[in-house]
A protein has these predicted regions:
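VWA/integrin I-like adhesion module and closely mimicked acidic/polar interface patches used
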Residues: 32-83, 90-95
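Von Willebrand factor
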Residues: 1-25, 36-37, 59-66, 86-91
Length: 98
């Protein structure tokens, strides 16, 4: 259900950005994707939901399968080892713009 959650989060961020005039960032931390929509549906839904003021950053943790469509859609995508707490923390902070 990662894909539908990402679409909802991006749509919410786009609404927030439009309402405030500020840019918004969506950070997704995932261990893999349970596909609830195919690649074409996901890409189309994400294109409909997003705006120029929203960025999507994804941190993929561990050895699970990387969602190629999510990776392609992300403005930034990082894969980290789940056993390296420092690397994980750094990747999340970077994705969040901290």
């Amino acid at each position: 259900q990662t894909r539908s959650a990402v679409v909802a989060a991006v749509a919410n961020a786009a609404d927030q950005a439009a309402g405030t005039g500020d840019k918004a960032r969506v950070v997704v931390v995932t261990t893999g994707t349970e596909q609830d929509m195919d690649d074409a549906q996901f890409t189309s839904a994400l294109d409909d939901a997003t705006s120029k003021d929203v960025s999507l950053s994804v941190v993929h943790v561990g050895e699970g399968n990387v969602d190629a469509a999510l990776k392609s859609a992300a403005d930034s995508f990082t894969t980290v080892d789940s056993t390296d707490e420092t690397q994980l923390s750094g990747a999340i902070n970077k994705a969040a713009g901290i």
